[in-house]
Amino acid sequence: MAVAPPSYCFVAFPPRAKDGLVVFGKNSARPRDEVQEVVYFSAADHEPESKVECTYISINQVPRTHAIVISRPAWLWGAEMGANEHGVCIANEAINAREPAAETEALLGMDLVRLGLERGATAKEALDVIVALLEEHGQGGNYYEDANSCHSFQSAFLIVDREEAWVLETVGKYWAAEKITEGVKCICNQLSLTTKIDAEHPELRSYAQSQGWWMGEDEFNFSEVFSPADDHLTCCSGRDTLEKQEESITVQTMIDVLRDKASGVCVDSESFLTTASVVSVLPQNGSSPCIHYFTGTPDPSRSIFKPFIFVDDVKLVPKAQSPCFGDDDPAKKEPRFQEKPDRRHELYKAHEWARAVLESDEEQGQKLRKTMLELEKQGLEAMEEILTSSDPLDPTEVGDLFYDCVDTEIKFFK
């Protein structure tokens, strides 16, 4: 498999973001044929001493988990990106570091995204959850559904809530984190933290010294110390994409950035593709709801961003969920990945038809794209009304919001 291109996570805080909103966005660059699903899990209570089965290992469950909505490769337990009922959003980046990632099966970075969302009611709580689990269980295992080779990586995370964000970068069990409360931040598939470190593993610096990577004389620069060769000197091409925006950053701005192929933010190569995208808007005014827009389909430039709002009675969306193969899933059997089952869900299949039209028939494709963007615009305008309204949100009106959007999209493609 070719070397994976970068995927990007962004966050913008006021005053760069509009109207007291925190805006979060993520593109997931993964193997072209991999299917992502969008799944909602309600809050739940769990029996004492119960276990939770993650992608490769089981760990102790906590007494209560928060409601979450996630976008994930359909073969694994965790998530590439997602949000919880408390307005916490997390996205994961696969990182190469000076210390090779373990191939031994442990927690994946994607597992840690989901665990952070399920167990953290703030961005800082989610960070604390992730680093505690790293210390206890470590990270490792194949990031791809590939029987021929193990693709293992270290992990970086962008963890965001209504008030602050944390960039968390990890190498094995060691980690450093930076707190963000203003401006624009982007992370991709490189270590990015330098000398501004607001929290760290207690043995981070002594470990670097023991490996001969830092002598203790110069100022400690995390990415210089832990990056392979001169990797830390190169700059992600998408890093300036948001910063150069002259207008206040909105949901539409973030969507446009995620659709930008010229900058490399939207990946479309022979082996890799942006297989799913998300944009979240988190009002700093706690009385307004957080809104999360998922594609559930590949290539955001040819997808519709569909809104989701947490309420007590969220209607499940099986049409955006992949088939379940249970214990017969080749991802759960050892040796793993001996077969590749058809994981396409109904929305994905409908979108395949749309992609074929967009690629093969210029006139029909232009009409189709125009209609897709009009559907998306209607959703964005309806959500803008919710955010600017002084009336309290009626949960009965939005419990089936994402369901209706997916259903409308599928019917339109048919």
UniProtKB/Swiss-Prot annotation:
Pfam families: Peptidase_C69 (PF03577)
Domain of life: Eukaryota
Locations listed in the record: Cytoplasm
GO BP terms, alphabetized: exocytosis; proteolysis
A GO molecular function held by the record: cysteine-type exopeptidase activity
InterPro entries, per database record: Peptidase_C69
Sites bearing N-acetylalanine, chain numbering: A2
Family label: Belongs to the peptidase C69 family. Secernin subfamily.
Extra remark beyond the main annotation: 'Secern' is an archaic English term meaning 'secrete'.
Name listed for the protein in its UniProt record: Secernin-1
Species whose genome carries this gene: Bos taurus
Gene coding for it: SCRN1
